[in-house]
A protein has these predicted regions:
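Acidic, metal-coordinating catalytic segment for phosphate/diphosphate chemistry
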Residues: 1-35, 39-41
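A residue-level structural signature of the nucleotidyltransferase/glycosyltransferase Rossmann-like core
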Residues: 5, 44-45, 131-132
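A short, polar/proline- and glycine-enriched secondary-structure boundary/capping micro-motif
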Residues: 26-28, 56-61, 132
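A glycine-rich, hydrophobic loop/mini-helix early in the fold
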Residues: 33-64
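Charged phosphate-binding loop/patch that engages nucleotide di/tri-phosphates or the phosphate backbone
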Residues: 148-171
């Protein structure tokens, strides 16, 4: 089944055009990718491991992905989190941490406080094959061992101080 994404301009305005997933982006066209750091309030971050068949095989990451055509950023992150972990969250529960842009993509980085037992996580076949709650020090060890997807490692290092502050606050 073909999947389409909305096309944005560099200033994040919708253009009204659609992009077929898996095809090259044209100059001046941008998609939207969303990511979420799920934290438990006890100093841990939820990570999932990519299956061997995917790029960055066997590395750990946070949940996220591309927004589908017609989705808002919040709709996309709620869908991605549920698809990849089985965790349901209302759009109002997500907190926007940061936004970014590269050559063809706008990024929205969210966080969500949720203390979900690992046994309740439902992994998405073909996407992820393991899950863990990782402390900040463990995440740093995984980064040093190159066991966290490099893009995700960069995100974590940029957003670490904010994530640490959030761990110390009550809902």
């Amino acid at each position: 089944m073909e999947e389409f994404n909305d096309v944005y301009d560099k200033d994040r305005n919708l253009t009204g055009r659609l992009h077929l997933r898996g095809t090259p982006w044209k100059p001046g066209e941008y998609g939207l990718v969303v990511c979420v750091w799920v934290y438990d309030g006890k100093g841990n971050i939820l990570l999932t491991r990519r299956v061997p068949e995917k790029s960055f095989a066997g590395t750990w990451e946070n949940s996220g992905g591309a927004a589908k055509a017609g989705e808002t950023s919040l709709q996309a992150i709620a869908r991605e989190l549920f698809e990849e972990t089985g965790i349901r969250a209302g759009e109002e529960e997500f907190q926007l941490l940061d936004r970014g842009r590269d050559s063809f993509t706008h990024y929205d980085y969210y966080c969500l406080k949720r203390d979900t037992p690992l046994g309740d996580i439902v992994l998405l076949p073909g996407e992820t094959d393991d899950v863990q709650w990782a402390s900040f020090s463990k995440i740093h060890r995984l980064i040093a061992q190159k066991k966290i997807c490099r893009v995700i490692a960069g995100q974590f290092l940029r957003q670490e101080q904010t994530l640490r502050r959030l761990q110390d606050t009550k809902p």
